[in-house]
Amino acid sequence: MQPRAHATAAVLTAALVLATGCASGSSTSSPSATSASSHSSSESSTTPNSQAPSNSGTSSIPAPKPVTGKPATITIGASGDLIAHASTVAQARAAAGGQGYAFAPFFAALKPTVEAPTISICQMENPLSRTNTDLSVEYSFNAPREFATATRSMGFDGCSTANNHTWDRGQQGMEETREVLAANDLKASGPGTKAGEKGQPVFYEANGLKVAQLSYSYSLINAVGDQWSVPKEAPWLKDAMWFTRTSKGVVKDAAAARAQGADLVLVSMHWGYEYEGVNAQQKQVTAELMRSGQVDWIIGNHPHVVQPCDKVNGRYVTYSLGNFFSGQIAAIKPGTADGAFAAVTFERDAAGKWKQSMTFQPTYQNQTTRHVELASPTSNADSYRKTVRTMGLMGCDAKPAS
Protein backbone atom coordinates (compact mmCIF):
# COMPACT_ATOMS: atom_id res chain seq x y z
CA MET A 1 0.00 0.00 0.00
CA GLN A 2 1.22 3.48 -0.81
CA PRO A 3 2.01 5.81 2.10
CA ARG A 4 -0.95 7.95 2.98
CA ALA A 5 -1.84 10.98 5.05
CA HIS A 6 -4.64 10.77 7.58
CA ALA A 7 -7.32 13.43 7.50
CA THR A 8 -7.25 15.44 10.70
CA ALA A 9 -10.11 14.41 12.95
CA ALA A 10 -12.39 17.01 14.46
CA VAL A 11 -11.75 17.84 18.07
CA LEU A 12 -13.02 14.87 20.02
CA THR A 13 -15.79 15.37 22.52
CA ALA A 14 -13.97 13.12 24.94
CA ALA A 15 -10.29 12.27 25.12
CA LEU A 16 -9.78 8.67 24.13
CA VAL A 17 -6.90 8.07 26.45
CA LEU A 18 -6.27 5.42 29.03
CA ALA A 19 -5.31 6.87 32.38
CA THR A 20 -4.19 3.94 34.42
CA GLY A 21 -0.98 2.37 35.52
CA CYS A 22 0.47 -0.94 34.58
CA ALA A 23 -0.19 -3.76 36.95
CA SER A 24 2.15 -6.70 37.12
CA GLY A 25 -0.22 -9.54 36.77
CA SER A 26 -1.56 -10.81 40.02
CA SER A 27 -4.63 -12.99 39.91
CA THR A 28 -6.77 -10.35 41.59
CA SER A 29 -9.47 -8.67 39.59
CA SER A 30 -8.58 -5.47 37.81
CA PRO A 31 -9.38 -2.16 39.49
CA SER A 32 -12.46 -0.28 38.45
CA ALA A 33 -12.14 2.54 35.98
CA THR A 34 -12.53 5.07 38.78
CA SER A 35 -9.84 3.70 41.06
CA ALA A 36 -6.14 4.42 40.80
CA SER A 37 -4.19 1.66 39.15
CA SER A 38 -0.75 0.96 37.82
CA HIS A 39 1.25 -1.46 35.67
CA SER A 40 -0.01 -4.85 36.75
CA SER A 41 -1.34 -7.44 34.39
CA SER A 42 -4.78 -6.45 35.41
CA GLU A 43 -5.15 -2.83 34.39
CA SER A 44 -8.32 -0.92 33.78
CA SER A 45 -9.36 1.52 31.09
CA THR A 46 -11.15 4.80 31.46
CA THR A 47 -12.21 7.70 29.31
CA PRO A 48 -11.59 11.18 30.74
CA ASN A 49 -14.55 13.49 30.97
CA SER A 50 -12.63 16.51 29.74
CA GLN A 51 -12.61 17.57 26.12
CA ALA A 52 -9.62 16.94 23.92
CA PRO A 53 -7.48 20.03 23.39
CA SER A 54 -7.54 22.03 20.20
CA ASN A 55 -4.43 21.30 18.16
CA SER A 56 -4.99 23.68 15.27
CA GLY A 57 -2.15 25.72 13.88
CA THR A 58 0.47 23.03 13.39
CA SER A 59 0.90 24.02 9.75
CA SER A 60 1.92 27.59 10.65
CA ILE A 61 5.53 26.49 11.27
CA PRO A 62 7.44 26.14 7.98
CA ALA A 63 8.68 22.67 7.05
CA PRO A 64 12.46 22.26 7.34
CA LYS A 65 14.57 23.07 4.29
CA PRO A 66 16.45 20.13 2.73
CA VAL A 67 20.19 19.82 3.29
CA THR A 68 21.80 19.26 -0.10
CA GLY A 69 25.13 17.74 -1.06
CA LYS A 70 25.43 15.60 2.07
CA PRO A 71 24.18 12.04 1.54
CA ALA A 72 23.89 10.17 4.83
CA THR A 73 22.41 7.01 6.32
CA ILE A 74 21.55 6.06 9.89
CA THR A 75 19.53 3.27 11.51
CA ILE A 76 17.66 3.93 14.75
CA GLY A 77 16.10 1.22 16.91
CA ALA A 78 13.32 1.50 19.48
CA SER A 79 11.83 -0.94 21.97
CA GLY A 80 8.54 -1.48 23.72
CA ASP A 81 8.08 -0.75 27.42
CA LEU A 82 10.69 -1.79 29.99
CA ILE A 83 8.98 -2.17 33.38
CA ALA A 84 10.60 -3.59 36.52
CA HIS A 85 7.54 -4.92 38.31
CA ALA A 86 7.99 -6.14 41.87
CA SER A 87 7.90 -9.76 40.69
CA THR A 88 10.77 -9.27 38.24
CA VAL A 89 12.79 -7.32 40.82
CA ALA A 90 12.45 -10.33 43.13
CA GLN A 91 13.55 -12.68 40.35
CA ALA A 92 16.57 -10.49 39.58
CA ARG A 93 17.48 -10.51 43.27
CA ALA A 94 17.30 -14.28 43.37
CA ALA A 95 19.36 -14.57 40.18
CA ALA A 96 22.07 -12.48 41.86
CA GLY A 97 22.11 -14.75 44.89
CA GLY A 98 20.70 -12.03 47.10
CA GLN A 99 23.61 -9.70 46.36
CA GLY A 100 22.43 -6.95 44.05
CA TYR A 101 20.12 -7.56 41.08
CA ALA A 102 20.94 -9.58 37.96
CA PHE A 103 18.76 -8.24 35.13
CA ALA A 104 21.19 -8.83 32.25
CA PRO A 105 20.28 -12.54 31.81
CA PHE A 106 16.66 -11.54 31.14
CA PHE A 107 17.78 -9.54 28.09
CA ALA A 108 20.72 -11.58 26.78
CA ALA A 109 18.99 -13.10 23.75
CA LEU A 110 18.12 -9.65 22.36
CA LYS A 111 21.57 -8.10 22.80
CA PRO A 112 22.63 -8.54 19.12
CA THR A 113 19.29 -7.10 17.97
CA VAL A 114 19.58 -4.00 20.16
CA GLU A 115 23.25 -3.47 19.31
CA ALA A 116 22.69 -3.64 15.54
CA PRO A 117 21.24 -0.13 14.89
CA THR A 118 23.44 2.95 14.98
CA ILE A 119 21.36 4.26 17.91
CA SER A 120 18.90 2.31 20.09
CA ILE A 121 16.32 3.89 22.39
CA CYS A 122 14.21 2.31 25.13
CA GLN A 123 10.99 3.28 26.90
CA MET A 124 11.97 3.25 30.60
CA GLU A 125 8.62 2.98 32.35
CA ASN A 126 9.75 3.25 35.93
CA PRO A 127 11.91 5.50 38.07
CA LEU A 128 15.37 4.25 39.01
CA SER A 129 16.76 4.20 42.53
CA ARG A 130 20.30 5.35 43.21
CA THR A 131 20.33 3.53 46.57
CA ASN A 132 18.15 0.51 45.70
CA THR A 133 15.57 1.50 48.29
CA ASP A 134 11.79 1.96 48.17
CA LEU A 135 11.59 -0.39 45.19
CA SER A 136 8.59 -1.42 43.10
CA VAL A 137 5.33 -2.48 44.68
CA GLU A 138 2.00 -3.10 42.98
CA TYR A 139 0.87 0.00 41.06
CA SER A 140 3.93 2.04 42.00
CA PHE A 141 7.36 1.45 40.53
CA ASN A 142 11.02 2.03 41.29
CA ALA A 143 13.76 -0.14 39.80
CA PRO A 144 17.19 -0.93 41.22
CA ARG A 145 20.10 0.89 39.61
CA GLU A 146 21.20 -2.44 38.08
CA PHE A 147 18.18 -2.24 35.78
CA ALA A 148 19.83 0.70 34.01
CA THR A 149 23.17 -1.11 33.94
CA ALA A 150 21.58 -4.08 32.19
CA THR A 151 19.73 -1.78 29.79
CA ARG A 152 22.99 -0.15 28.76
CA SER A 153 24.92 -3.41 28.58
CA MET A 154 22.52 -4.85 26.01
CA GLY A 155 23.11 -1.93 23.65
CA PHE A 156 20.63 0.85 24.40
CA ASP A 157 21.98 4.39 24.07
CA GLY A 158 19.17 6.24 25.80
CA CYS A 159 15.57 6.10 26.97
CA SER A 160 12.35 8.02 27.09
CA THR A 161 11.36 8.79 30.69
CA ALA A 162 7.94 10.35 29.99
CA ASN A 163 5.18 7.99 31.10
CA ASN A 164 2.42 7.66 33.66
CA HIS A 165 4.90 6.38 36.28
CA THR A 166 7.38 9.26 36.00
CA TRP A 167 6.22 10.69 39.35
CA ASP A 168 5.90 7.37 41.23
CA ARG A 169 8.73 8.46 43.56
CA GLY A 170 8.14 12.17 43.27
CA GLN A 171 10.71 14.79 42.36
CA GLN A 172 13.51 12.91 44.11
CA GLY A 173 12.69 9.85 42.05
CA MET A 174 12.91 11.88 38.86
CA GLU A 175 16.28 13.27 39.91
CA GLU A 176 17.62 9.83 40.81
CA THR A 177 16.37 8.39 37.53
CA ARG A 178 18.35 10.95 35.57
CA GLU A 179 21.41 10.39 37.77
CA VAL A 180 21.30 6.61 37.38
CA LEU A 181 20.81 6.81 33.62
CA ALA A 182 23.71 9.26 33.26
CA ALA A 183 25.94 7.08 35.45
CA ASN A 184 25.30 4.26 32.99
CA ASP A 185 25.95 6.42 29.92
CA LEU A 186 22.29 6.44 28.93
CA LYS A 187 20.72 9.63 27.60
CA ALA A 188 17.26 10.63 28.82
CA SER A 189 14.39 12.36 27.05
CA GLY A 190 11.42 13.53 29.10
CA PRO A 191 10.42 16.14 31.67
CA GLY A 192 13.06 18.10 33.53
CA THR A 193 13.46 17.48 37.25
CA LYS A 194 12.92 21.07 38.39
CA ALA A 195 11.57 24.42 37.23
CA GLY A 196 13.67 25.93 34.47
CA GLU A 197 15.43 22.66 33.68
CA LYS A 198 14.95 21.47 30.13
CA GLY A 199 14.70 17.70 30.09
CA GLN A 200 14.53 17.61 26.31
CA PRO A 201 15.29 17.42 23.52
CA VAL A 202 18.16 15.03 23.89
CA PHE A 203 20.58 14.78 20.97
CA TYR A 204 22.44 11.83 19.49
CA GLU A 205 25.20 12.32 16.92
CA ALA A 206 26.40 9.61 14.55
CA ASN A 207 27.30 9.18 10.87
CA GLY A 208 27.48 12.93 10.41
CA LEU A 209 23.86 13.36 11.53
CA LYS A 210 22.28 14.93 14.60
CA VAL A 211 19.18 13.17 15.90
CA ALA A 212 16.79 14.75 18.42
CA GLN A 213 14.35 12.90 20.65
CA LEU A 214 11.32 14.41 22.39
CA SER A 215 9.09 12.46 24.78
CA TYR A 216 5.54 13.10 26.01
CA SER A 217 2.94 11.23 28.05
CA TYR A 218 -0.80 11.58 28.59
CA SER A 219 -0.08 11.74 32.34
CA LEU A 220 3.05 11.78 34.47
CA ILE A 221 1.35 11.12 37.81
CA ASN A 222 -0.69 8.02 36.92
CA ALA A 223 -3.95 9.92 37.25
CA VAL A 224 -7.16 8.15 36.33
CA GLY A 225 -9.39 10.21 34.06
CA ASP A 226 -7.25 13.34 34.35
CA GLN A 227 -4.84 14.37 31.61
CA TRP A 228 -4.41 17.94 32.86
CA SER A 229 -3.14 17.81 36.44
CA VAL A 230 0.38 17.89 37.80
CA PRO A 231 1.58 18.21 41.40
CA LYS A 232 1.38 21.77 42.73
CA GLU A 233 5.09 21.72 43.37
CA ALA A 234 5.93 20.63 39.81
CA PRO A 235 4.04 22.81 37.30
CA TRP A 236 6.79 22.40 34.70
CA LEU A 237 5.72 18.79 34.13
CA LYS A 238 2.96 20.03 31.84
CA ASP A 239 5.58 20.70 29.18
CA ALA A 240 5.99 16.93 28.75
CA MET A 241 2.27 16.07 28.74
CA TRP A 242 1.01 15.90 25.18
CA PHE A 243 -2.55 16.59 26.26
CA THR A 244 -1.60 19.99 27.69
CA ARG A 245 1.30 20.67 25.33
CA THR A 246 -0.97 19.89 22.33
CA SER A 247 0.20 18.91 18.87
CA LYS A 248 1.01 22.54 18.11
CA GLY A 249 3.37 22.65 21.08
CA VAL A 250 5.04 19.38 20.12
CA VAL A 251 5.59 20.66 16.58
CA LYS A 252 7.04 23.87 18.04
CA ASP A 253 9.42 21.77 20.17
CA ALA A 254 10.42 19.73 17.12
CA ALA A 255 11.09 22.89 15.11
CA ALA A 256 13.21 24.23 17.98
CA ALA A 257 15.24 21.00 17.94
CA ARG A 258 15.86 21.49 14.23
CA ALA A 259 16.94 25.05 14.93
CA GLN A 260 19.58 23.51 17.22
CA GLY A 261 20.88 21.47 14.31
CA ALA A 262 18.79 18.30 14.35
CA ASP A 263 18.61 16.52 11.01
CA LEU A 264 15.99 14.08 12.31
CA VAL A 265 13.41 14.43 15.09
CA LEU A 266 11.91 11.44 16.89
CA VAL A 267 8.84 11.88 19.09
CA SER A 268 8.07 9.27 21.75
CA MET A 269 4.38 9.23 22.71
CA HIS A 270 2.98 7.47 25.77
CA TRP A 271 -0.64 7.23 24.69
CA GLY A 272 -3.66 5.11 23.83
CA TYR A 273 -5.78 2.47 25.53
CA GLU A 274 -4.08 -0.41 27.27
CA TYR A 275 -4.58 -3.84 25.65
CA GLU A 276 -6.55 -2.39 22.73
CA GLY A 277 -6.03 -1.23 19.16
CA VAL A 278 -5.27 2.21 17.77
CA ASN A 279 -7.89 4.79 18.74
CA ALA A 280 -9.19 7.91 17.03
CA GLN A 281 -7.15 10.35 19.09
CA GLN A 282 -3.89 8.60 18.25
CA LYS A 283 -4.76 9.03 14.57
CA GLN A 284 -5.71 12.66 15.10
CA VAL A 285 -2.44 13.51 16.83
CA THR A 286 -0.50 11.55 14.21
CA ALA A 287 -2.04 13.56 11.39
CA GLU A 288 -1.29 16.84 13.13
CA LEU A 289 2.35 15.96 13.81
CA MET A 290 3.15 14.35 10.48
CA ARG A 291 1.63 17.03 8.27
CA SER A 292 3.98 19.55 9.91
CA GLY A 293 7.07 18.06 8.30
CA GLN A 294 8.92 18.49 11.61
CA VAL A 295 8.58 14.93 12.97
CA ASP A 296 10.31 11.97 11.33
CA TRP A 297 9.15 9.03 13.46
CA ILE A 298 6.50 8.71 16.16
CA ILE A 299 7.44 5.97 18.62
CA GLY A 300 4.35 4.95 20.57
CA ASN A 301 4.08 2.98 23.80
CA HIS A 302 1.80 2.38 26.81
CA PRO A 303 -0.88 -0.10 25.55
CA HIS A 304 1.37 -3.09 26.48
CA VAL A 305 0.32 -4.90 23.34
CA VAL A 306 1.64 -4.48 19.83
CA GLN A 307 -0.39 -2.08 17.69
CA PRO A 308 0.00 -1.57 13.91
CA CYS A 309 2.61 0.60 12.31
CA ASP A 310 1.69 3.11 9.64
CA LYS A 311 3.47 5.31 7.14
CA VAL A 312 2.13 8.85 6.90
CA ASN A 313 3.61 11.25 4.36
CA GLY A 314 6.50 8.81 3.95
CA ARG A 315 7.29 8.72 7.70
CA TYR A 316 6.71 5.91 10.15
CA VAL A 317 4.36 5.77 13.09
CA THR A 318 4.69 2.79 15.43
CA TYR A 319 1.58 3.22 17.54
CA SER A 320 2.69 0.73 20.21
CA LEU A 321 5.66 -1.62 20.29
CA GLY A 322 4.15 -3.68 23.10
CA ASN A 323 6.17 -4.85 26.07
CA PHE A 324 9.88 -5.47 25.84
CA PHE A 325 10.27 -6.53 29.48
CA SER A 326 7.68 -6.62 32.26
CA GLY A 327 6.09 -8.73 34.96
CA GLN A 328 2.71 -8.80 33.27
CA ILE A 329 1.00 -12.16 32.85
CA ALA A 330 -0.25 -12.95 29.36
CA ALA A 331 -2.73 -15.50 30.71
CA ILE A 332 -4.54 -12.60 32.39
CA LYS A 333 -3.91 -9.93 29.76
CA PRO A 334 -3.35 -11.60 26.36
CA GLY A 335 -0.68 -10.04 24.19
CA THR A 336 1.40 -8.58 27.01
CA ALA A 337 4.21 -11.09 26.39
CA ASP A 338 4.58 -9.89 22.79
CA GLY A 339 6.71 -7.02 21.58
CA ALA A 340 8.44 -5.58 18.54
CA PHE A 341 11.88 -4.01 18.38
CA ALA A 342 11.66 -1.60 15.44
CA ALA A 343 14.63 -0.39 13.41
CA VAL A 344 14.17 2.46 10.94
CA THR A 345 16.84 3.28 8.38
CA PHE A 346 16.88 6.92 7.30
CA GLU A 347 18.66 7.71 4.02
CA ARG A 348 19.34 11.22 2.72
CA ASP A 349 20.38 11.63 -0.90
CA ALA A 350 22.50 14.38 -2.43
CA ALA A 351 19.39 16.46 -3.15
CA GLY A 352 18.47 16.40 0.53
CA LYS A 353 15.51 14.07 0.08
CA TRP A 354 14.90 11.54 2.86
CA LYS A 355 13.75 7.95 2.46
CA GLN A 356 12.74 5.59 5.29
CA SER A 357 12.57 1.82 5.57
CA MET A 358 11.76 -0.31 8.60
CA THR A 359 12.38 -3.80 9.88
CA PHE A 360 11.11 -5.13 13.17
CA GLN A 361 12.12 -8.05 15.36
CA PRO A 362 9.16 -9.74 17.06
CA THR A 363 9.93 -10.59 20.69
CA TYR A 364 8.35 -12.83 23.28
CA GLN A 365 8.81 -12.82 27.04
CA ASN A 366 8.96 -16.30 28.51
CA GLN A 367 6.23 -16.43 31.13
CA THR A 368 8.20 -18.68 33.49
CA THR A 369 11.79 -17.43 33.29
CA ARG A 370 10.81 -13.87 32.27
CA HIS A 371 13.64 -13.95 29.72
CA VAL A 372 13.00 -11.93 26.56
CA GLU A 373 13.31 -14.22 23.55
CA LEU A 374 13.32 -13.84 19.79
CA ALA A 375 10.09 -14.77 18.05
CA SER A 376 10.36 -16.29 14.59
CA PRO A 377 8.46 -18.71 12.32
CA THR A 378 10.15 -21.58 14.17
CA SER A 379 10.53 -20.20 17.71
CA ASN A 380 7.65 -18.69 19.69
CA ALA A 381 5.80 -18.99 16.39
CA ASP A 382 2.34 -18.03 17.66
CA SER A 383 3.68 -14.79 19.08
CA TYR A 384 5.57 -14.13 15.85
CA ARG A 385 2.49 -14.59 13.69
CA LYS A 386 0.39 -12.31 15.90
CA THR A 387 2.98 -9.54 15.88
CA VAL A 388 3.63 -9.70 12.14
CA ARG A 389 -0.10 -9.68 11.40
CA THR A 390 -0.76 -6.77 13.77
CA MET A 391 2.10 -4.64 12.50
CA GLY A 392 0.73 -4.91 8.96
CA LEU A 393 -2.93 -4.16 9.66
CA MET A 394 -2.69 -0.56 8.44
CA GLY A 395 -0.67 -1.34 5.33
CA CYS A 396 2.71 -0.47 6.80
CA ASP A 397 5.57 -1.63 4.57
CA ALA A 398 7.82 -2.68 7.48
CA LYS A 399 9.32 -6.16 7.21
CA PRO A 400 9.91 -8.69 10.00
CA ALA A 401 13.60 -9.27 10.65
CA SER A 402 13.19 -13.01 11.22
What does each of the following model-derived ranges do?
Residues 23-58:
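Short, low-complexity, disordered segments immediately C-terminal to signal peptides
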Residues 2, 49-402:
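Acidic, metal/ion-coordinating pockets
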Residues 18-21:
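C-terminal motif of bacterial Sec signal peptides marking the signal peptidase cleavage site
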Residues 1-11:
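Bacterial N-terminal signal peptides that target proteins for export
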